Amino acid sequence: TGATGFIGRYLVEKLLQRGKPVYALVRKTSLKKLDALRTTLGATEKTLIAVPGDLAKKNFGLTDAEVKKLKGKIDHVFHLAAIYDLNASADDQKVANVDGTRNAVRFAEAIGAGCFNHVSSIAAAGLYDGTFR
């Protein structure tokens, strides 16, 4: 998740250098952003594969057949998508950042991914008094 975001673009570039297809969950409204990223990185639809879905839905809104099709094809799930806008409502932040992360973990389990990588901001730690080490 988050392939078209600031960090995601750099991660996708590095993953593509490994020579294996990269699957990117992308909102239907962001498919053009993924096309632009393909152009920038010299990727094709076969090397940078769009998985249109919704972070807020179970299995990202994919059908059981679509989930089954992805089993065994994805070893690592990288979850970068989040709402960082502090002006966003608490409900919107919860749906994206809490429920979305839960959905990403469950999706990784559903497709049999062996590794789940979550990238977030320091805000994910909540209120903390002290020094992060």
Regions found by a protein language model. Name each.
Residues G42-H76:
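Conserved Rossmann-fold cofactor-binding substructure of NAD(P)-dependent oxidoreductases
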Residues K20-P21, T47, G114-C115:
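Residues at the starts of beta-strands that form the adenosine-phosphate
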Residues T1-K20, A24:
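N-terminal Rossmann NAD(P)H-binding glycine-rich loop of SDR-like oxidoreductase domains
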Residues V26, L80-A81:
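Glycine-rich, N-terminal phosphate-binding loop of Rossmann-like dinucleotide-binding domains
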Residues R18-K32, S120:
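Conserved glycine-rich Rossmann-like NAD(P)H-binding loop of the short-chain dehydrogenase/reductase
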Residues H76-L80, N87-V95, D99-R133:
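Conserved Rossmann-fold NAD(P)-dependent oxidoreductase catalytic core, especially the SDR/UDP-sugar
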Residues G5, A82-I83:
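Flexible cofactor-recognition loop at the NAD(P)H-binding site
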Residues K32-E45:
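Short, conserved SAM-binding/catalytic segment
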